Amino acid sequence: MPKTQRGIYHNLKESKYVASNNDVTFFFSSELYLNKFLDGYQEYRKKFNKKIERVAVTPWNMDMLADITFYSEVEKRGFHAWLKGDNATWREVHVYALRIMTKPSTLDWSRIQKPKLRERRKSMV
């Protein structure tokens, strides 16, 4: 299904609105949602960490978990993500976020062009 006249993709797999942090890639149905995510993820990380600290003080880096939660809140038309160039389910992305909690920092997000199949295969090797 192609994009609508207003530039909205109902099938996220076809979307050209893409954000990546080099490990995880999120697809958005509209440019509005993409910009909303890119403009707000850092502030959301701060809010998310404050919520966690109210319950327990933890040495873990919760940024990726916050980013996944924020993506789910921003993108209303589904969930489509790649993990290191391969399709990933919601659960797989969460497991990845739990694995990297011990890393001291999380990469920042940036807008990218949707990789072509050949480039995607290179990143998987």
Curated annotation (Swiss-Prot):
Residues within the DNA-binding region(s): 77-96
Site feature location: Interaction with host RNA polymerase and activation of the phi29 late A3 promoter: R120
Gene3D superfamilies: Phi-29-like late genes activator, P4 (3.30.70.3560)
Signal peptide: none
Transmembrane stretches, start-end: none
InterPro entries: Phi-29-like_sf, Phi-29_GP4
Entries under Pfam families matching the protein: Phi-29_GP4 (PF05464)
Repressor among keywords: yes
Record keyword Transcription regulation present: yes
Domain of life: Viruses
Annotated GO MF terms: DNA binding; DNA-directed RNA polymerase activity; sigma factor activity
Record key words, sorted: Activator, DNA-binding, Early protein, Repressor, Sigma factor, Transcription, Transcription regulation
Function noted in UniProt: Mediates, together with protein p6, the early to late transcriptional switch by stabilizing the binding of host RNA polymerase (RNAP) to the late A3 promoter. Activates transcription from the late A3 promoter and represses the main early promoters A2b and A2c by modifying the topology of the sequences encompassing early promoters A2c and A2b and late promoter A3 in a hairpin. Binds to a region of the A3 promoter located between nucleotides -50 and -100 relative to the transcription start site, that presents a sequence-directed curvature.
Assembly mode: Interacts with host RNA polymerase (via C-terminus). Interacts with DNA; binds to the A2b, A2c and A3 promoters.
Family: Belongs to the phi29likevirus late genes activator p4 family.
Protein name: Late genes activator p4
